[in-house]
Amino acid sequence: MSSSLWLQCLQQLQEELPATEFSMWVRPLQAELNGNTLTLFAPNRFVLDWVRDKYLNSINRLLQEYCGNDIPHLHFEIGNKRVTAPKSETIAPARTRTAADVAAESSAPAQLQARKPVHNIWRDEEPVAVDLNHRSNVNPKHKFNNFVEGKSNQLGLAAARQVSDNPGTAYNPLFLYGGTGLGKTHLLHAVGNAIVDNKPNAKVVYMHSERFVQDMVKALQNNAIEEFKRYYRSVDALLIDDIQFFANKERSQEEFFHTFNALLEGNQQIILTSDRYPKEINGVEDRLKSRFGWGLTVAIEPPELETRVAILMKKAEDHQIHLADEVAFFIAKRLRSNVRELEGALNRVIANANFTGRPITIDFVREALRDLLALQEKLVTIDNIQKTVAEYYKIKVADLLSKRRSRSVARPRQLAMALAKELTNHSLPEIGDAFGGRDHTTVLHACRKIAQLREESHDIKEDYSNLIRTLSS
């Protein structure tokens, strides 16, 4: 059995899994073959449990395929593989180079490609004195235990947890992107709180990108730019929200570029959020956009129905209000764009119930949210979905209704059907009828196909999220 066994498995898994999943869960694994036992080393318990739960069957299948009857026994451990392994074959660390790796290496400064060990708080055994006057700005209310997990934010939450457990080493930088009100800021604060809980001496700073700009301007005005540099380069974790506001601010970008490099070289954690994918941020230098993608980039999508219901139930519980399941589903089916909108609607319902003393029923919600529901129903129609999808893909609405089966038409048609199922209250037969008299089974197939492609294709996932944002805004 050759030492390339695990590398063969890696190469196949990289083809089968979405790039984000592969980078987050599989690539960090190290492997060692000793006799008839293949040991996979995970960096922490969270990764180990996730891999065993999600990918064990795939790994065993590949081992069976490559080894036949000589399939090795699979064993998992936490930590790094042993430095020496006498009388055994040692498989290289699980680091499969991709095109993204090559691009990052070609643009990364030499000192960051071969990062030197740096004395920092994550490895200090003794307490370190920290300036207690530093501005943390981390909101203690936003923690992991009150963040509602769903399919739309599962990867982002998992990445944030890993970073909080292994700051400066797990994924650096971590870049979270998605529309307004989807929970990116909550995750930033949750990471900050978790880091401080684990390491009370850690100097964690959260801020909006505009605050960084304001601080730099004040430093220039007061001839205190060196103090500014020292402050930002001394933090153990820098959490910056809405990085897209750096657009067209050349001096701020220049200073952040050097701050970014200094923090990364010092193994200090950086987490950034934006409303769009790094390469789509206009007005930001290419060298910065390249660096944004050096660690891990994760999309936070609009919450699906089940997550929206869970969010409403959790918020109602926080207010010590009983919310019937059917009421939660009624609200969740009609308000789909983001978490903030859901919370605002629920707050209005609760306030009205407190003022009037009436029970929260579907009829009461329909009355309390009359204007909001009317606006949503007016905005999202099948006709509107068809026009928006056709415009997005630069085809005609008539193409969506036609019998054409070319990929350039069939895929947008399937997306439009899936969006109609997600964003309207029409039945499958009604949706099929609106798309050229198609059968309800065709609509069902389209919905399932798009759900599958959103897991496998970054482009389809992005298109779907963009269309949801456009139609819900």
Swiss-Prot record:
Location within or outside the cell: Cytoplasm
Gene Ontology BP term (one): regulation of DNA replication
InterPro entries: AAA+_ATPase, Chromosome_initiator_DnaA, Chromosome_initiator_DnaA-like, Chromosome_initiator_DnaA_CS, DnaA_C, DnaA_dom, DnaA_N_dom, DnaA_N_sf
Annotated spans, Domain III, AAA+ region: 137-353
Annotated stretches, region: Domain I, interacts with DnaA modulators: 1-90
Annotated stretches, region: Domain IV, binds dsDNA: 354-473
GO cellular component: cytoplasm; plasma membrane
The name this protein goes by in its record: Chromosomal replication initiator protein DnaA
